[in-house]
């Protein structure tokens, strides 16, 4: 196991197109860090730079105590798991697992020991003599992970490994990957655009936006205290409701809210909004009169899509099956502890 340190890492193409803009990050020994962000934010490029598949323009990357800027990928003591399984179709599972080790002149007895250990951990012992075409998508992904595990590397790098799987299998595999990483204790960097994967798997999240880091923290820290409007809207589904200043007759901040001078954006998550029944006091964080436009039942809860009196959208969640009707007018509110205030620059105003 090894820590990974990025110090002011930059990547430019053609000398003037900068895609990674001074990223500094320390990943602790044994930590599972997820790089997350929209398409084009630089997360896969950054992972490939750690792996040595992309050169860096400036800065340093260290794995363990060694600066690896000019070290070949094969010498960095890392193992990658890709979106595409990249298995040799003419080889058995056993041969696929052994291939890289044979190229490194690993003794035969050691190869067999590592294969047996990985196969047991991944529960693929019964598939060792099969070829990839005889396996399901989930089984192939386990083999791809096994090929990384037998390397016994200092770090695992995962590049959107679940993207080709169906929704049910993705849930199963993300649990398995996290369980496996915890049992092995291997430093891991995982790239995804799927916030559900990011939130459920990460020890820490790194949210990237246009080549720079927006925020680093645990999933709950980013969810409860987003550092910017970008993070607030990217983390969480449905997305956080955002209302621009100045407030109007359509909505009002509560009596317990202190607003910054100048422009601001007021945020509240769908699950923090409640319907105020007749006779309720106004909520101390946020109040609005809304018209219900649509109701989505998603099993144990319903999402209500509504409109403020000025036409701006608002979405909120209620438990179970909603009994409210389309075009019904309701008053909603939120507590002061559940609202988020962002300044004119889009950054969070200190609580």
Swiss-Prot record:
Gene3D superfamilies: Nucleic acid-binding proteins, P-loop containing nucleotide triphosphate hydrolases
Biological process according to GO: carbohydrate transport; glycerophosphodiester transmembrane transport
Keywords noted in UniProt: ATP-binding, Cell inner membrane, Cell membrane, Membrane, Nucleotide-binding, Sugar transport, Translocase, Transport
Family per similarity comment: Belongs to the ABC transporter superfamily. sn-glycerol-3-phosphate importer (TC 3.A.1.1.3) family.
InterPro entries hit by this protein: AAA+_ATPase, ABC_transporter-like_ATP-bd, ABC_transporter-like_CS, ABC_transpr_MalK-like, ABC_transpr_MalK/UgpC-like, Mo/tungstate-bd_C_term_dom, NA-bd_OB-fold, P-loop_NTPase
A family per Pfam: ABC_tran
Signal peptide: none
EC number(s) stated in the UniProt entry for this protein: 7.6.2.10
Protein name: sn-glycerol-3-phosphate import ATP-binding protein UgpC
Disulfide bonds: none
Domain ABC transporter: 4-235
Example of a GO cellular component annotation carried by this entry: ATP-binding cassette (ABC) transporter complex, substrate-binding subunit-containing
Class of enzymatic activity (EC top level): translocase
Oligomeric and partner information: The complex is composed of two ATP-binding proteins (UgpC), two transmembrane proteins (UgpA and UgpE) and a solute-binding protein (UgpB).
Protein residues bound to ATP: 37-44
Membrane topology per record: Peripheral membrane protein
UniProt main location, coarse: membrane
Function: Part of the ABC transporter complex UgpBAEC involved in sn-glycerol-3-phosphate (G3P) import. Responsible for energy coupling to the transport system.
């Amino acid at each position: 196991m090894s820590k990974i340190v990025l110090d002011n890492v930059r990547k430019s193409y053609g000398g003037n197109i900068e895609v990674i803009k001074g990223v500094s990050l320390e990943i602790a020994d044994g930590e599972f860090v997820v790089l997350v962000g929209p398409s084009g934010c630089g997360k896969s490029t950054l992972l490939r730079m750690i792996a040595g598949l992309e050169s860096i323009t400036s800065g340093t990357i260290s794995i363990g105590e060694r600066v690896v800027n000019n070290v070949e990928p094969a010498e960095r003591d890392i193992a990658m798991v890709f979106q595409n399984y990249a298995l040799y179709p003419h080889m058995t599972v056993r041969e696929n697992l052994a291939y890289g080790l044979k190229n490194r002149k690993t003794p035969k007895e050691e190869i067999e020991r590592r294969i047996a250990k990985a196969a047991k951990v991944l529960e693929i012992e019964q598939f060792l003599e099969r070829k990839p075409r005889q396996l399901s998508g989930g089984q192939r992904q386990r083999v791809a992970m096994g090929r990384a595990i037998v390397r016994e590397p200092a770090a695992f790098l995962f590049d959107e490994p679940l993207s080709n799987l169906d929704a049910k299998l993705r849930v199963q595999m993300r649990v398995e990957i996290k369980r496996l990483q915890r049992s092995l204790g291997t430093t891991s960097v995982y790239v995804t655009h799927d916030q559900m994967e990011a939130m459920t798997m990460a020890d820490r999240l790194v949210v990237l936006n246009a080549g720079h880091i927006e925020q680093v923290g645990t999933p709950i820290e980013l969810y409860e205290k987003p550092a910017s409007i970008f993070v607030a809207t990217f983390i969480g589904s449905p997305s956080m409701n955002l209302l621009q200043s100045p407030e109007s007759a359509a909505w009002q901040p509560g009596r317990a809210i202190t607003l910054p001078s100048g422009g601001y954006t007021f945020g509240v998550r769908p699950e923090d909004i409640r319907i105020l029944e007749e006779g309720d006091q106004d909520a101390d964080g946020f109040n609005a009169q809304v018209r219900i436009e649509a109701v989505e039942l998603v099993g144990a809860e319903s999402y209500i899509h509504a409109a403020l009196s000025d036409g701006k959208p608002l979405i909120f969640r209620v438990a179970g099956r909603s009994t409210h009707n389309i075009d019904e007018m309701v008053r909603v509110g939120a507590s002061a502890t559940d609202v988020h205030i962002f300044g004119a620059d889009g950054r969070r105003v200190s609580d």
